Amino acid sequence: MSDNLALHGTTILCLKKNEDIIIAADGQVSHGNTILKSSARKLRTIANNKIIAGFAGSTADGLALFEKLEAKIEKYSYNLLRSAVELAKDWRSDKYLRRLEAMMIVADRSHILILTGNGDVVEPENNVAAIGSGGLFALSAARALMSCENNLTAEEIALKSMNIAADLCVFSNRNIIMEKVV
């Protein structure tokens, strides 16, 4: 099995439309070309849905990063941007953390951020971010739907985009879980 497939076998999408911020994730867990589970939960909420995070990559690594992020968020008084930067610095410089194979999207009312093991904290343009093997499909669909004149809600755009990604990416499925930042 390729390490690249192990790292990126999922789809996580986050978007903001008007005042609504949605993070969506598919439910498929794959190992190589085998589906191990179709209803995994890849999203976690922090501070009563004020901060939501989703991960792509190794499940154990993603959960370890959630714990580290949650500790940083508490340490820095729920300042997501500072917490993300501090986590990224630790992730890049710590001998143990550097080996973690995952990416994260985190969002609150003010920021949508992509965090990588390279120490990157990226705030994407156009209020849309996606990671994982189906990420580019979901990102493209969401950006297209958001650029059209329509009455679709953030939830509807996220669901349509995730379903398009699931149709195109063999490592993603249509068992979509969505969370809304409050």
UniProtKB/Swiss-Prot annotation:
Listed SUPFAM superfamilies: N-terminal nucleophile aminohydrolases (Ntn hydrolases)
GO cellular-component term (any): proteasome core complex
Primary site of residence: cytoplasm
Enzyme class: hydrolase
Superkingdom of this protein's organism: Bacteria
EC number, UniProt record: 3.4.25.2
Known catalytic reactions: ATP-dependent cleavage of peptide bonds with broad specificity
Purpose: Protease subunit of a proteasome-like degradation complex believed to be a general protein degrading machinery.
Protein name as catalogued: ATP-dependent protease subunit HslV
Organism for this UniProt entry: Rickettsia canadensis (strain McKiel)
